[in-house]
């Protein structure tokens, strides 16, 4: 039943019918369900209509960033005055982190233009925006961040973005030097000899290893902890 309702909601959003009588559909589907799907499809008119019924939180900028919902992001920043550098309580990251994590190029570009800090906050649990873009293999977002001044060797849990490339390459037969993101990072001066710093808490199979050592470490260990 839930899946059927979700499919019906998505069809209504795609056809723009829902914006004609959003209050009735809120009764049927629920405010939060409509808001979530409206943002994911970048239906800013629906989001605006929902805002008339109940104030839409500026923290929805995280969801808009994850979904590359540029129109919604613009409305949240320019009309709702959302802070592009707001920090999430759980992950200690910003909307730009969310955009980088999901490869949302258009929103990442917009957020930076509006003053988003390209290096995010120190101590973000999932790493700085560049690390997240590299880890997700989003070359265009990584290039954008570097062009806008992102620190090429900024670490996440002791690892630089080059270490993230090495981890991605590790499970393939590719030579790391042929990887486009590797070449991009090196062109911006990334340290190819950097070692993974030992963590204060926990253990990683990568601790103390260089980029090349990680890339060549092809055999996965049972129960390994990254």
UniProtKB/Swiss-Prot annotation:
Paired cysteines (S-S): none
Gene3D superfamilies, A to Z: Ankyrin repeat-containing domain (1.25.40.20)
Swiss-Prot/TrEMBL keywords: ANK repeat, Repeat
GO cellular component: ubiquitin ligase complex
Residue ranges of ANK repeats: 56-86, 91-120, 125-154, 157-194
Transmembrane segments: none
GO biological process: ubiquitin-dependent protein catabolic process
InterPro entries: Ankyrin_rpt (IPR002110), Ankyrin_rpt-contain_sf (IPR036770)
PROSITE patterns named in the record: ANK_REP_REGION (PS50297), ANK_REPEAT (PS50088)
PANTHER family for the chain: ANKYRIN REPEAT AND SOCS BOX PROTEIN 1 (PTHR24173:SF27), ANKYRIN REPEAT CONTAINING (PTHR24173)
The protein, known as: Putative ankyrin repeat protein RF_0939
Organism: Rickettsia felis (strain ATCC VR-1525 / URRWXCal2) (Rickettsia azadi)
High-level lineage: Bacteria, Pseudomonadati, Pseudomonadota, Alphaproteobacteria, Rickettsiales
């Amino acid at each position: 039943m839930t899946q059927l309702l979700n499919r019906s909601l998505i069809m209504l959003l795609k056809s723009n019918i829902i914006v004609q009588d959003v209050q009735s559909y809120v009764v049927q589907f629920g405010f939060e369900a409509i808001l979530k799907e409206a943002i994911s499809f970048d239906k800013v008119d629906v989001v605006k209509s929902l805002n008339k019924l109940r104030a839409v939180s500026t923290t929805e900028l995280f969801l808009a960033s994850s979904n590359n919902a540029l129109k919604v992001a613009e409305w949240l920043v320019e009309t709702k005055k959302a802070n592009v550098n707001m920090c999430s309580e759980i992950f200690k990251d910003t909307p730009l982190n969310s955009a980088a994590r999901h490869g949302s190029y258009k929103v990442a570009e917009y957020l930076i233009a509006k003053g988003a800090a390209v290096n995010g906050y120190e101590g973000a649990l999932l790493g700085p925006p560049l690390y997240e873009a590299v880890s997700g293999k989003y070359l265009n977002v990584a290039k954008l961040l570097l062009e806008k001044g992102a620190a090429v060797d900024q670490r996440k849990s002791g690892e630089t973005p080059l270490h993230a490339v090495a981890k991605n390459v590790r499970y393939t037969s590719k030579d790391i030097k042929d990887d486009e993101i590797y070449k991009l990072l090196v062109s911006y001066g990334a340290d190819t000899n950097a070692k993974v710093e030992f963590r204060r808490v926990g253990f990683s199979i990568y601790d103390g290893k260089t980029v090349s050592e990680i890339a060549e470490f092809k055999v996965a260990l049972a129960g390994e902890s990254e």
